Amino acid sequence: MTDCVQFRLMQADDLDRVVALEQHAFSHPWTRALYLDALTSYECWMMYLDDQHVGHGVISQIVDEAHLLNIAIAVNHQGKGLGLQLLEHLMQRASQRGCVE
């Protein structure tokens, strides 16, 4: 089976999965409350490998400048290039939104 990477915008009903991944990936993970705020203020993306949530990222935009606020890949999927794919997706989204930096 070929691995298929897909992206979609994060939704509030994703937060249980997002917070669980964060807690395994980081010693100081973002909280559910931070993600709830991020959903209304920033672009939050989910990354799937086949049908499995393997990562997520958050970007903010100020005028024409983008900032990467968070990026996470599931521990058991790290070292496979997925972080780079997620970063490239987030950079492409920022560019599509008019960001030049």
PLM features per residue range, with description:
Residues 2, 9-80, 84-97:
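Acetyl-CoA-dependent GNAT
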